């Protein structure tokens, strides 16, 4: 579970799921585009929509107050990045590789090495 402090209030964020993704899209936000283009403001707003279970206008208001109150956009985007790391669904949708393929590749390499040693 990820914790994020937005506008001086701390929220516990459950694992991001399909419904969270569709909530972002229902607010007119393509999180895949925003993420791939590095649009941090849009990403922060989309994540705020999910965390607060609110619409885009309310998220804009809250993020604005967060920044005016001395908070940083990175408070929100860093928490989003951590939440994405914990969500298999969001990692897949955003095209983020997991560690498993690397392990599989390493295992394949070890097996190839053993085969080469056997051939010699």
Model-derived segments and spans:
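Short, hydrophobic/amphipathic alpha-helical patches that form generic packing surfaces
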Residues: 42-53, 78-82
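Short linear motifs in exposed loops
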Residues: 14-16
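Charged interaction scaffolds used for protein-protein
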Residues: 2-10, 19-21, 26-35, 56-120
């Amino acid at each position: 579970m990820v914790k994020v402090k937005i506008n001086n209030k701390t929220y516990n964020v459950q694992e991001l799921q399909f419904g969270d993704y569709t909530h972002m899209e229902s607010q007119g936000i393509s999180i895949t585009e925003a993420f791939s283009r590095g649009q941090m403001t849009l990403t922060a707003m989309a994540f705020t929509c999910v965390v607060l279970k609110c619409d885009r206008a309310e998220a804009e208001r809250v993020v604005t107050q967060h920044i005016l109150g001395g908070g940083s956009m990175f408070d929100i985007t860093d928490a989003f990045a951590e939440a994405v790391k914990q969500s298999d669904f969001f990692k897949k949708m955003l095209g983020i590789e997991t560690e498993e393929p690397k392990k599989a590749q390493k295992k394949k390499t070890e097996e190839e090495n053993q085969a080469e040693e056997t051939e010699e």
